[in-house]
């Protein structure tokens, strides 16, 4: 609800950045953003464990647009998924109590990400398998 005299001005956001770099978040993702932030010297910082659900949402949105036949740069799809795989494999993650909508999106991402052991090796991640990544993401977010 806008205050008296307030106006909305539509702005164009380049399609390649709109999925992750959203200006407006729905209530569930805004709640997740607040839950996952630390304030350091007056700056809000999103902890890395909480960045993963946002990257998963970006991947899901891009993947859905791709399925509908819209132009999606496949490098963006690959980047979001590979970033999540690297973070899960290389960082110590905290258990995140996600809002239900975000948790549902994470479950969809885990189900749809289709990572293989060969892709893990291609990322030069040693001592980790695709199933390890799926299990870790499930344990941390679901």
Predicted regions span which residues?
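Compositionally biased terminal segments of proteins
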Residues: 1-142
């Amino acid at each position: 609800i806008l205050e008296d005299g307030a106006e909305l001005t539509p702005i164009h956001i380049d399609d390649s950045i709109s999925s992750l770099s959203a200006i407006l978040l729905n209530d569930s993702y805004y709640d997740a953003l607040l839950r996952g932030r630390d304030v350091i010297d007056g700056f809000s910082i999103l902890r890395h464990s909480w960045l993963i659900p946002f990257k998963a949402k970006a991947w899901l949105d891009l993947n859905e647009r791709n399925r509908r036949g819209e132009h999606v740069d496949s490098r963006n799809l690959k980047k979001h998924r590979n970033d999540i795989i690297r973070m899960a494999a290389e960082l110590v993650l905290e258990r995140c109590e996600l809002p239900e909508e975000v948790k549902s999106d994470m479950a969809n991402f885990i189900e749809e990400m289709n990572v293989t052991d060969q892709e893990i090796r291609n990322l030069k991640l040693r001592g980790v398998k695709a199933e390890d990544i799926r299990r870790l993401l499930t344990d941390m977010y679901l």
